[in-house]
């Protein structure tokens, strides 16, 4: 990208939609100019954010008994069409491969919108005994959905380039339920590492995953007050096991159907991270996922330039040996232009080293998240930088948590809900009846996210739709 383009002004974050679209380009995360609607190209810098984010996901899954695998992209139509309720949820979104070259295929092949119907025929072959449980596999793949709504990079795509889907198999319904709870905990930890606080809720029956007994989900509240679904966990019961004949031999020798779960995270995790933490200057990245964690800016005068450059290179090498991703900006740009460039890219920490700093054996450290400036002794630069990273991570999470709480409103009637969802998320009593939930959604003009997994009960209240007493409150929000 040319320097003149990089110097273009980023819209203010309060104009969130414009800010988001421009930031993806100006910070070199994604290029939207690919000639197919809903398909986008990762810039190398953006892909490095993706790589670091998915490294966290892999680490957390691998350390909890999951194993990574890879299944084919193409799903035969006869397998795809087996689970009727599941297909109802996806049939209008499927891309079909109907020809090989110029020859029609005997069996059309679906590009996976999700992989249950690709994986479970193999699970039928692999699962034999109760000793095989729990089976916990995951893959990180691209999936395709023919989105007819307005597409948006990282948020609503026709090609989801980074879909992490886990699929587990268990002996009993209760074992699968325990896995759902574990998965929610794992996802919460992933987002803690990204400094993104989440809402956790159980979706209403009409919004659960097609073919599931129930769905739990994680949502982030975006700067415009809308919620973004950033993780889902589905208890599949034995529904898919019956469809795909996944049985196991129990300890008593009896053949029984297995119980399953599946859960997914996509690049929406990155959309939430950059949206929640970013500011009017550009990205603000948690240190763990920043492609460049530290940028060193030499402050050059006529005298002492060689010594300053040498000191900057020395600090760079020391930080690299400590496992820190670091760059020295020795370009001909003015210091102000360098600050602009690296602030746009969200580099967590800037170190400035000039002749006077060398005399005092220090570097000036500037935090990207707060702009706070102080000094770190060069003798202990590695430890000093690590302490800054810890402080940045803690500050980002606490700030985002406070912002989230300020956007949750406990309401008493539907008109108040209608008003408050323009700012964030409302809670309202609900008796649990489907007809009441749908009537409330219709009145409000927004959806019920679900019942909070950590209840927000205020004692006995009345359902605003029917007047029945209830102690349950639900989240209501505008959604992406």
UniProtKB/Swiss-Prot annotation:
Location of this chain's protein in the cell: Cytoplasm
UniProt key word Manganese: no
The keyword Protein biosynthesis is annotated on this UniProt entry: yes
Any GO MF annotation of the entry: proline-tRNA ligase activity
Enzyme class: ligase
Cellular compartments per GO CC: aminoacyl-tRNA synthetase multienzyme complex; cytoplasm
PROSITE patterns, sorted: AA_TRNA_LIGASE_II
Database matches in InterPro entries: aa-tRNA-synt_IIb (IPR002314), aa-tRNA-synth_II (IPR006195), aa-tRNA-synth_II/BPL/LPL (IPR045864), Anticodon-bd (IPR004154), Anticodon-bd_dom_sf (IPR036621), Pro-tRNA-ligase_IIa (IPR002316), Pro-tRNA-ligase_IIa_arc-type (IPR004499), Pro-tRNA_ligase_II_C (IPR016061)
Origin: domain of life: Archaea
Catalytic reactions on record: tRNA(Pro) + L-proline + ATP = L-prolyl-tRNA(Pro) + AMP + diphosphate
GO biological process: prolyl-tRNA aminoacylation
Subunit structure: Homodimer.
The protein's role, per its UniProt record: Catalyzes the attachment of proline to tRNA(Pro) in a two-step reaction: proline is first activated by ATP to form Pro-AMP and then transferred to the acceptor end of tRNA(Pro).
Cited PANTHER family: BIFUNCTIONAL GLUTAMATE_PROLINE--TRNA LIGASE, PROLYL-TRNA SYNTHETASE
Family listed: Belongs to the class-II aminoacyl-tRNA synthetase family. ProS type 3 subfamily.
Swiss-Prot/TrEMBL domain comment: Consists of three domains: the N-terminal catalytic domain, the anticodon-binding domain and the C-terminal extension.
Name by which UniProt lists this protein: Proline--tRNA ligase
Organism: Methanosarcina mazei (strain ATCC BAA-159 / DSM 3647 / Goe1 / Go1 / JCM 11833 / OCM 88) (Methanosarcina frisia)
Gene field: proS
């Amino acid at each position: 990208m040319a320097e003149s383009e990089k110097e273009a002004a980023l819209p203010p974050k309060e104009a969130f939609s414009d800010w988001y679209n421009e930031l993806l380009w100006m910070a070199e995360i994604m290029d939207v100019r690919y000639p197919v609607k809903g398909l986008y190209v990762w810039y190398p810098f953006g892909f490095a954010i993706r790589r670091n984010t998915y490294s966290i996901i892999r680490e957390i899954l691998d350390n909890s008994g999951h194993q990574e695998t890879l299944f084919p992209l193409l799903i035969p139509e006869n397998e795809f069409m087996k689970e009727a309720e599941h297909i109802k949820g996806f049939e209008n979104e499927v891309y079909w491969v109907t020809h090989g070259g110029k020859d029609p295929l005997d069996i059309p092949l679906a590009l996976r919108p999700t992989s249950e119907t690709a994986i479970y025929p193999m699970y039928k072959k692999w699962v034999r005994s109760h000793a095989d449980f729990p089976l916990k596999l995951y893959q990180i793949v691209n999936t395709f959905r023919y989105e007819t709504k307005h597409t948006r990079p990282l948020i609503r795509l026709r090609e989801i380039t980074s879909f992490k889907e886990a699929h587990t198999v268990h002996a009993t319904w209760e074992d699968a339920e325990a896995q759902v709870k574990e998965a929610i905990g794992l996802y919460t930890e992933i987002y803690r590492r990204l400094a993104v606080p989440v809402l956790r809720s159980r979706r209403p029956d009409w919004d659960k995953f097609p073919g599931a007994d129930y769905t739990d989900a994680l949502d982030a509240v975006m700067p415009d007050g809308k919620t973004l679904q950033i993780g889902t966990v589905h208890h599949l019961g034995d529904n898919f096991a019956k469809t795909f004949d996944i049985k196991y031999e129990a300890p008593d020798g009896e053949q029984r159907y297995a119980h399953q779960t599946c859960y997914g995270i996509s690049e929406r995790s990155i959309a939430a991270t950059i949206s929640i933490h970013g500011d009017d200057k550009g990205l603000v990245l948690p240190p763990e996922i920043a492609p460049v964690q530290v940028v060193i800016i030499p402050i050059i005068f006529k005298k002492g330039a060689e010594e300053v450059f040498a000191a900057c290179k020395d600090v760079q090498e020391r930080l690299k040996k400590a496992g820190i991703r670091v760059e020295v900006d020795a370009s001909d740009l003015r210091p102000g232009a360098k600050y602009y460039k690296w602030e746009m890219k969200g580099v967590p920490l800037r170190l400035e080293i000039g002749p006077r700093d060398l005399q005092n054996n220090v570097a000036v450290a500037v935090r990207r998240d707060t702009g706070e400036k102080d000094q770190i002794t060069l003798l202990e630069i590695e430890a000093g930088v690590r302490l800054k990273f810890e402080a940045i991570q803690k500050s980002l999470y606490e700030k985002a948590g406070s912002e989230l709480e300020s956007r949750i409103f406990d309401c008493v009637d539907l008109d108040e809900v209608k008003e408050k969802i323009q700012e964030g998320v409302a809670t309202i009593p609900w008796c649990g009846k489907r007809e009441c939930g749908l009537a409330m959604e219709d009145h409000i003009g927004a959806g019920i996210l679900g019942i909070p997994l950590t209840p927000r009960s205020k004692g006995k209240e009345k359902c605003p739709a029917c007047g029945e007493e209830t102690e349950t409150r639900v989240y209501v929000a505008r959604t992406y």
